[in-house]
C-alpha cells in the first residue's frame, strides 16, 4: 500500500514515516500542498495522510478543491485537537477519517488499515468491468481503485449501462430510467448526462449507436 504523507512538522513526519514503514507500508513524504499536488498527478497512491495546517495553504480547503475536481484518493486528516469541531462538520467534504493530534502511532496504523479494508472490500459486492466497479447496494462507483463522484442521474445511467453491458440500451429505456413517467425532459438531457458520465469514466467506454442508443463495452 502506497501512502502519501502531507505533513510539514519534521519531527512528526519522521516518526510517521518510520512507524508506517515498519508496519509494511510504502511512504512518500512531502511538506507542502504544492508538492502533494505534483505527487498526486503522477498517480500510484492508495491513501493520503493530510495535515490541515501547512505553510502554503489550508489542507481542508485543498481537500474540498480536490474532491470538487474529482480527486478521490482516500484521505485521513491529521488535525490539532482544537480544530475537531470544525473538522467534524466538514467530513462531508470528502475526508474518509481523521485523527486529532497528538495521537498514538498504533491508532494511526489501525485507522490506515481500516480505510484500506473498506476500500478493498468495496469490490466484493460490486459489478465490474475491468477497472470500473459499481456497488448497487451503496450506490457507489470506483474506477482504478478511486471513488468517482457521480450525480444521481449519472449513477442511474451507468447502472443501466452496466446491467446491460455488451448490448445496446435504447435511448427511450435510458430516458425512462432517468426521468420516469410524466417528467418533462429537455431534448438533449440524456446527451448532457451521457457526456458528463463519459468524461468521468472515459469517453471510449460507451459507444453511441446512432438512432438507437448506447452500448457500454465489455473489457
Swiss-Prot record:
Which keywords label this protein?
Cytoplasm, DNA-binding, Phosphoprotein, Transcription, Transcription regulation, Two-component regulatory system
Q: Which GO terms describe its biological process?
A: regulation of DNA-templated transcription
Name of one Pfam family that matches: Trans_reg_C
Kindly indicate which segments of the sequence are annotated as binding DNA: 124-218
User: What is the reported phenotype of gene knockout?
Assistant: Mutation in either rssA or rssB confers a precocious-swarming phenotype on LB agar: swarming occurs at 37 degrees Celsius and is initiated at a lower cell density and more rapidly than the swarming of the parent strain at 30 degrees Celsius. Both mutants also exhibit increased hemolysin activity and altered cell surface topology.
Query: What name goes with this protein?
Result: Swarming motility regulation protein RssB
Q: Where in the cell is it found?
A: Cytoplasm
- Entry keyword Transmembrane helix: no
The yes or no answer to whether the keyword Transcription regulation is present is yes
- Where in this protein does the record say 4-aspartylphosphate is found? 51
Q: What does the record give as the function of this protein?
A: Member of the two-component regulatory system RssA/RssB involved in regulation of swarming motility which has been shown to be inhibited by saturated fatty acids. RssA/RssB regulates cellular fatty acid composition, hemolysin production and cell surface topography. RssA/RssB negatively regulates the activity of SlhBA. It can also act as a negative regulator for the control of the swarming initiation. RssB binds its own promoter.
Supply the InterPro entries for this chain. Answer: CheY-like_superfamily, OmpR/PhoB-type_DNA-bd, Sig_transdc_resp-reg_receiver, WalR-like, WH-like_DNA-bd_sf
Q: Which GO terms describe its cellular component?
A: cytosol; protein-DNA complex
Name all Response regulatory domain ranges.
2-116
GO MF term set: phosphorelay response regulator activity; transcription cis-regulatory region binding
Amino acid at each position: 500500500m502506497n501512502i502519501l504523507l502531507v505533513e510539514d512538522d519534521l519531527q512528526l513526519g519522521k516518526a510517521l514515516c518510520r512507524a508506517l514503514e515498519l508496519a509494511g507500508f510504502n511512504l512518500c513524504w512531502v511538506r507542502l500542498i504544492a508538492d502533494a499536488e505534483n505527487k498526486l498527478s503522477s498517480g500510484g497512491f492508495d491513501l493520503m495522510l493530510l495535515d490541515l495546517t501547512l505553510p502554503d495553504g489550508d489542507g481542508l480547503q485543498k481537500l474540498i478543491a480536490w474532491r470538487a475536481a474529482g480527486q478521490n484518493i482516500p484521505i485521513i486528516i491529521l488535525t490539532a485537537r482544537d480544530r475537531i469541531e470544525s473538522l467534524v462538520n466538514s467530513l462531508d467534504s470528502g475526508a474518509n477519517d481523521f485523527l486529532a493530534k497528538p495521537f498514538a502511532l498504533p491508532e494511526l496504523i489501525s485507522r490506515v488499515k481500516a480505510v484500506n479494508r473498506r476500500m478493498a472490500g468495496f469490490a466484493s459486492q460490486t459489478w465490474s468491468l475491468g477497472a470500473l466497479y459499481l456497488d448497487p447496494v451503496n450506490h457507489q462507483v470506483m474506477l482504478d481503485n478511486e471513488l468517482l463522484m457521480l450525480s444521481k442521474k449519472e449513477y442511474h445511467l451507468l447502472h443501466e449501462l452496466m446491467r446491460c453491458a455488451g448490448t445496446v440500451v435504447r435511448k427511450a429505456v435510458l430516458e425512462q430510467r432517468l426521468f420516469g413517467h410524466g417528467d418533462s425532459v429537455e431534448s438533449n438531457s440524456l446527451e448532457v448526462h451521457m457526456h458528463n458520465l463519459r468524461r468521468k469514466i472515459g469517453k471510449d467506454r460507451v459507444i453511441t449507436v446512432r438512432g438507437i442508443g448506447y452500448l457500454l463495452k465489455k473489457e
